Each structure stands twice: as structure tokens, then as C-alpha cells.
From Swiss-Prot:
Interacts with UvrB in an incision complex. It comes from Salmonella schwarzengrund (strain CVM19633). The lineage of its organism: Bacteria, Pseudomonadati, Pseudomonadota, Gammaproteobacteria, Enterobacterales. GO terms for cellular component: cytoplasm; excinuclease repair complex. It is found in: Cytoplasm. This is UvrABC system protein C. The UvrABC repair system catalyzes the recognition and processing of DNA lesions. UvrC both incises the 5' and 3' sides of the lesion. The N-terminal half is responsible for the 3' incision and the C-terminal half is responsible for the 5' incision.
Amino acid sequence: MSEIFDAKAFLKTVTSQPGVYRMYDAGGTVIYVGKAKDLKKRLSSYFRSNLASRKTEALVAQIQHIDVTVTHTETEALLLEHNYIKLYQPRYNVLLRDDKSYPFIFLSGDTHPRLAMHRGAKHAKGEYFGPFPNGYAVRETLALLQKIFPIRQCENSVYRNRSRPCLQYQIGRCLGPCVAGLVSEEEYTQQVEYVRLFLSGKDDQVLTQLIARMEKASQDLAFEEAARIRDQIQAVRRVTERQFVSNAGDDLDVIGVAFDAGMACVHVLFIRQGKVLGSRSYFPKVPGGTELGEVVETFVGQFYLQGSQMRTLPGEILLDFNLSDKTLLADSLSELAGRRIHVQTKPRGDRARYLKLARTNAATALITKLSQQSTITQRLTALAAVLKLPAIKRMECFDISHTMGEQTVASCVVFDANGPLRAEYRRYNIAGITPGDDYAAMNQVLRRRYGKAIEESKIPDVILIDGGKGQLAQAKAVFAELDVPWDKHRPLLLGVAKGADRKAGLETLFFEPEGEGFSLPPDSPALHVIQHIRDESHDHAIGGHRKKRAKVKNTSTLETIEGVGPKRRQMLLKYMGGLQGLRNASVEEIAKVPGISQGLAEKIFWSLKH
């Protein structure tokens, strides 16, 4: 128990009503957030002589102050608890590190509706299908839909300004509603309805209607039309036969859990209208000594109750763990959704099969993650030995990206003992320097990054400067001038110069701007971790630079592809029906655009994919 915090006096003031409590350390930082049906009873349990775990002992030893917020109901307390966890990110809570919104397929409400991927708030008029686990799953589905139901996917700006059909029409991927006379309103509306039914899981209705149309076309001796519909029927059947589908038209999330070596993996399977839309693995941050029950309960609460991720609640949630607060969670989710949400932990039949699949995926993902972590640990240990450091707990790496001095962006990526810490990656827009002056850009980003107070835990052990002697000299000069309240001599500054022809494995490392550098063997684990963080920094900088260019010039990512100038860009968008159509096109289809060679088509294809 803390010597400073008077627990006995505090507990006398605590009510027995439901509510939320926040625990603070000596620095005024929230270190734990919890909820309780009975605040007095719950808080008293922290100050018994026989505490439940070492984690609780470590937590209680740091408490200097506790704030209590009383709520009307336990459901209210649960919602408030997860809002506070998201706000404060306390180190003794299990934390779900997932701030991305989930993508949907959007069917617009236009006269001739279009299909597109959508993230974020649902303001536009139309229908939304999903959620999908990631953008790749959406793009894959859109490409498939375009082959079966050829309705447009081009942007409205392209659609409204066409006088003749694009290449998508020529290859049978679009009915061409942009040009009068190519498709009847009735036929286009019918295809849109098929898409709507298909995305709603009503494949049987689609097939029934298509078969009826095929038979009618045959009776009317319209054999070409009948053959076209026959091909469409076969395409729908091929897709539905490949899918893991429940006949019940289920709308549910299936959550499997694996826990080993202090690390947890929670795998979520997204099922809508009986179709598996995809899945995703999560690795919540788990404080040492945390029990599996707390991991699962906290994850599920944060996953659904922190609403900024635009999460869509299913009608049912299947769980691979028997929660102690299952009824409370179901009530809270039902209140949030405005309809009844069921939480099941012992399903049967197809649902048990779903749960087994989620559990298997969680275990597989955890094994892979632990293997990767072991590799990272070995590499960091090897690098620490090379640099003569006791250990490396945190590394930061910087890179600069620009085109002919324009839209300069600096990136900072962070690795900890587990590898990339993507939540702490940062980009810096560089301004007020001579265009193309990489030294000035590095000087500016380092001053912005380190010329302020930094928490002890976030002071890096190693700072990698991508660029060799000149950039390292800038870093040394900046750190010599820093006047900050933290130990500026703690980080080891290391310059990394690319090898001849920029080949991996030939990098030269510099401790000082003067003198000769040194190289590591190409198979050195220490070199591999340097290459990893350097490449991450490079990719992060280029990504930021491309976004900045696209924003400034209001153009697509086509502008960043070498060999694609304004005329070719215009031709590509014109023939493919917009950027979405181009993204979904194959190399062969891109190569059919006038002025695009096979080699350039491959470059465009891979640039848009990656």
C-alpha cells in the first residue's frame, strides 16, 4: 500500500452506488480506470492485505489519489469507463490500439447509382453494406461485383462529363449509363437491384430472378440475351459456392481469443446476412499479470463502446469466453444500438463452427506474432551489442521526402522492444527552408521533435538519421544546442548511409560526421533491424509526401508514378471511367489504353496496389 495515500480515510467518503473510479500516481497521471456496481465494496478490495495479483500490488503501490464519478446505473458506468480509458490510456488497463474506421461498400442514391468504398460518417444519400475488416476486402469485393453486375464505379465528376463510353464499357465491366442509348433505364435499375440483393445476402432471390429472365429470353428466341444471363447465373453460383455461408442470414460478430506468454490475440470474424465479409486480428496492450478474463471483458467493451470508430453493431455477438458481466454488456450494447443485442458464449451448430474458426485464427495469429516478436528481440539485442548499449527499449528514425524541393515532408517512426509502434509514428510538414535543402529539413524536424519536454519512457535509446555524414552532422548540431529538461545525452545518434547503387546490405553506419564509418555483414541481425526501421521511415515519409502533393494539386496518386504525365493521366482516367475503375483494372486492361506500354501498365498497376 502507498505510504502517501490514506486509503482508510478515503474509503470512509466513498458511496455504495454504481460508478467509475480513476486512480492517479504521484505525477498526476491516470494509471487505472475501473467501474463498479458498488464503488465502496470494489475500492475496498484494493486495500486488503491479500491482493489478487502482482499487477494489483504494483498498481496500489503507486496510487496517490482516486477520483470517483457516481452514475445512475451500472450500464452508465460501463459506458463512462470505456470513454475514460480511451481518453486517458492508463498503463494498467488493457488497451485496444485501433483507431481506424471500418470501410463499407456504398451504393449511391444517384439516378444511375454507383458502387464505391466508403469510410467515416454516413452523410451521403444511399445504402451502406458492411462493415468490412479492411480496404483490401472492399476493393476485392468491388472488383468481383463489377464482373458480375456491371454497374458503374466511376466518380460522379467523370460520369457527368462523358460523351462516349470508357474502356470499362468496352470490356463488359459497365453498362455505360453515362451515354444515352447504351442501356435502358429498366435494365440498369434491374442490375442495381441484383447488387442490392446480393450484398444483402439474398443470393437465392438473385438466381431465381435471373433464371426466370433467361427462360423468358429463350422463349422469345433472344438467344444472345439468354446466353449473357446464363453467364451471369454461373458467375453468381461460382461466388456463392466458394463462400462459408450460413443459411440463417446471420448478422453477427464472432470473437475468438488466444493468450500465451503475456500476449493476447483477439480475432473478430465479421458476418453479415450470412456471409463472412472478412476477419481481423487485434493485439491489445496487456499489462503484466493480467488475467484472460479481464483481457476479454475490456477488449469487448472498448471494441463496441468507444463509438468514434464508426463500429456497426450486429444483432448477435459470439464469444469464446464466459464473461462475468455478459448481461450488463448485452444491456449496454442494446441501449447504444436502440435494439436488442444478444451475447452468446455457448453456441451450437453453425455458430459453434464460426467460433471454432475464430479461435483457430486467433491462435495462428498469436503464434506468428510471438515468432516475430522473438525475432525483433534477437535483432535488438544484437544491435545493442554492436552499439555497446545495455539494451535498446526505444528507437526513432527520421527520413525526408520531397519532389524537386516541393511539398517536403519529414517522417519519424518509432520501434520499441516489440517492433514498430505505429500509433506513435509522426509526419512533419517542413516549411520556411530553401527548396530541396535536406539538411535544413532535418534540422527543423529534430528541433520540433526534441526541443520540448519528453516523458522519461519516451526518450529514445537510439536515433537513426537516414542520410549519412551530412545529416548526422545536422543532428549533432541540433542536440548540442538543445536546452531541455530531459537528458539529451542519452540517445545515441547514428547515421545510416545507403550502399552503392542503394543495395540493401551495403549500408555504412556513422557514429560521428568525421572519419570512416563501419559496415555490418549482410546477414547480421543488427543490420536487419536497422534496415527495417529505415525502410519504415522511408515509406512513411513518401506516403506523407504523396498525400501532401495530392492535396495541394488536387490530383490522384497517378501523379507520383514516373512516366505518367498529364496527358497519359487524362487518358487513363477517361478510358477506365475514373480512378476507382483504374484501381480495379488488370495489367492487361491498363495496357489497352492508348499510349500505355505493357511495362508502364505494370508500373501503374503495382503503384496503385501498393
